[in-house]
Amino acid sequence: MLWTNCFSNILPLRENYIGLNEYSSKLLENAVNELSRLPGIGKRTALRMALFILKEDSLYADNLSKALVTLRNDICFCERCHNISDSDLCEICANHKRDELTICVVEDTRDVIAIEKTTQFSGVYHVLGGVINPMEGLGPNDLTISHLIKRVAEEQIKEVILALPATVEGDTTNYYIYKMISHFTTKITTIARGVAIGDELQYADEITLGRSIVNRLPFAQTR
C-alpha cells in the first residue's frame, strides 16, 4: 500500500516533467541527426562521431568541412566511363597504359575500386550508375547503357566483361546489354561465379574477386 502511494505521487510528476534536450544541446542534436543520415550510421554511432569531432582541434573540423564541401561541389563524372573523377577524364581512362579495347561493365564506382584492388584487370571501365530494377523505377534509359552501346560500336572494342552483381536485377541487366551489343563485338564475357549469389562486388574479398575476373567465362555459356 505504501509503495502504491509513492508511485501514485511520482507518476503525475513524471507526466508533467519537462526535461532537457536529449543531447543537452540543440547543436549536438542537429549534428547527430545529419550524421545518422549516412548509410549504416545509427544515432549512437553518429553521436560518437560528433563527440570525436568536438574533441579534436578546430583544424580537423575545418578540414573535414572543406573536404565535404569540395567533394559535393567540385567532383565530376568521367565523360568516357562515368566513373567519379576530378577532371573530364578519370585517371584510368587517361592512362594510355591501360587496355582501352577491353571494357569492364560495373554498377557503380565502388565496384571499380574493388576490382582495382585486385590488380587483376588492366582494361578500362564503364559505370552504369545502377542496374535495371522496375520495382525502383530504373529502366535502361535511366542508366548509361546507351553510351556503352555507342562506345562498343564506335571504338572497335575487342572484349566486354559484364561484372554486375549476381542478383536478379544484375542478371537482367547483363542479358539486356548482351542483346544490345552482341552484334558489335564477338567477345562478351562475365566474371566467374566466385562471388556468391546476391553478393555485391565491393563486399567480395580481393582474392575471390580477382579469380572471378581472371577465370571469366563467355556470357553465352552462362545462359
Where are these regions (language model features)?
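Cys/His-rich Zn2+-binding cysteine-cluster or related metal-binding knuckle/ribbon modules and their
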Residues: 22-29, 37, 49-112
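Long, charge-rich boundary regions
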Residues: 102-161
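Long C-terminal interaction/binding lobes of large macromolecular proteins
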Residues: 149-223
